[in-house]
From Swiss-Prot:
Keywords: Cytoplasm, Membrane, Nucleus. PROSITE patterns: C2_NT. Part of a complex composed of EEIG1, TNFRSF11A/RANK, PLCG2, GAB2, TEC and BTK; complex formation increases in the presence of TNFSF11/RANKL. Interacts with PRDM1/BLIMP1; following TNFSF11/RANKL stimulation in bone marrow-derived macrophages, the interaction promotes the binding of PRDM1/BLIMP1 to the gene promoter of IRF8. Interacts (via N-terminus) with TNFRSF11A/RANK (via cytoplasmic domain); when in the presence of TNFSF11/RANKL. Coiled coil: none annotated. Expressed during TNFSF11/RANKL-induced differentiation of bone marrow-derived macrophages to osteoclasts. The lineage of its organism: Eukaryota, Metazoa, Chordata, Craniata, Vertebrata. Residues 173-324 are annotated as: Disordered. Induction: Induced by NFATC1 in bone marrow-derived macrophages. Induced by TNFSF11/RANKL and TNF in bone marrow macrophages. Residues 129-138 are annotated as: Required for interaction with TNFRSF11A/RANK. Belongs to the EEIG family. This is Early estrogen-induced gene 1 protein. It comes from Mus musculus.
């Protein structure tokens, strides 16, 4: 029975990509990395030498190698396989280097998981001046099984989940996928342990919630009871456009909504009873007739609601016009001033007392003057002489 205790052997094709090193506390410098397998092989390699730019170094270097692992035959748990990445800095023009830090990765955690991205903090070789506690190394690891039993177990991951500030854990979805049938919803509720969703009351065209009919016990009875229009076209459009509920109520008052009245007397007599609700809440019952009733016509499409900015501007304008401010009370009205000036003026015809035309007078010394009938006495005394200008 000794062969049963022999460990299982595995071979994995490993693809290791050295992405970048961030939060480097150097403004300039040349960094490179040395990667090697501590367990499961003798792979050793060096990355390219890159300069520090904006406290970050990007290599984008890809390494491919074969990694050997073993597992416990009883549990199938893979044994640790350590892969070390050492970050180093060039000194003396590349002739020497200094070790900045390293990180150890257990490749057994990534076995058979495809491509995985991991960010690691660098660990310092000593505690003096070469520790880079805040530098973060980003790598990508992909492992594919080449040989061995495909049934194995990976050790628990050592990665730490970082919670984002301001994100509520209750916002995460508890279940994926959702069926529309009642069976799917009941199974989902039983798995998640949540209460079944409550049935919301139907909103009528008048904006009032309609209570569910107690006389209809099964979905077949609800389906065969007839046509029922719960909401008007305007209310449906307002829900799609995000319009307010108050406007949908007021706009749907003009539409008449028909609802099947399933009373005990009508179901017993076998007749068809229709209840019509108007804006005032009045109901009129139509007596059963021999001819089957025609389906109600589709109401005309209501006008398209205004844009939100137009509505707010109109509401603001109406409020300003209806409510005068203290500036309007203290300001002098220009129309009142113009009206007072017009009333104080005399616009009667005064041509009977004054001469409508002006005349030019020249005196003996050469002085001139313009006047009407006021200079008549001076003209008669010979002080001024009238001048007559004739057109040539």
């Amino acid at each position: 029975m000794a062969f049963l205790m022999k460990k299982k052997k595995f071979k994995f094709q490993t693809t290791f990509t050295l992405e970048e090193l961030t939060a480097v506390p150097f403004v300039n410098g040349v960094l490179f990395c040395k990667v090697r397998l501590l367990d499961g092989g003798d792979f050793v390699s060096l990355s390219s030498r890159e300069e520090v730019q904006e406290n970050c170094v990007r290599w984008r270097k890809r390494f491919t190698f074969v990694c050997k692992m073993s597992a416990n035959p009883a549990t199938g748990l893979l044994d640790p396989c350590i892969f070390r990445v050492s970050v180093r800095k060039e000194l003396k023009g590349g002739k020497a280097y200094s070790k900045l830090g390293f990180t150890d990765l257990n490749l057994a955690e990534f076995a058979g998981s495809g491509s995985t991205v991991r960010c690691c903090l660098l660990e310092g070789y000593d505690t003096k001046n070469t520790r880079q506690d805040n530098s973060i190394l980003k790598v990508t690891i992909g492992m594919f099984l080449l040989s061995g039993d495909p049934c194995f177990k990976t050790p628990p991951s050592t990665a730490k989940s970082i919670s984002i500030p301001g994100q509520d854990s209750s916002l995460q979805l508890t279940c994926k996928g959702g069926g529309t049938s009642s069976g799917g919803s009941s199974s989902t509720n039983s798995l998640t342990g949540s209460r079944p969703p409550k049935t919301r009351p139907t909103i009528l065209g008048s904006g009032l919630p309609e209570e569910p009919d107690q006389s209809l016990s099964s979905p077949e009875e609800v389906f065969h009871s007839g046509h029922s229009r719960n909401s008007s076209y305007a209310s449906q459009q307002s829900k799609l456009s995000g319009y307010s509920t108050e406007h949908s109520r007021s706009s749907s008052l003009s539409d008449l909504t028909h609802r099947r009245n399933t009373s005990t007397s009508s179901s017993a007599s076998g007749g068809l009873s229709m209840a019509v609700e108007g804006p005032e809440g009045m109901e009129r019952e139509h007596r059963p007739s021999e001819k089957p009733p025609r389906p109600p016509e589709k109401p005309p499409r209501p006008p398209r609601p205004l844009h939100l900015s137009d509505r707010s501007f109109r509401r603001k304008k109406d409020s300003v016009e209806s409510h005068p401010t203290w500036v309007d009370d203290t300001r002098i009205d220009a129309d009142d001033i113009v009206e007072k000036i017009m009333q104080s003026q005399d616009f009667t015809d005064g041509s009977n007392t004054e001469d409508s035309n002006l005349r030019l007078f020249v005196s003996r010394d050469g002085s001139t003057t313009l006047s009407g009938i006021q200079l008549g006495n001076r003209v008669s005394s010979g002080v001024y002489e009238p001048v007559v200008i004739e057109s040539h």
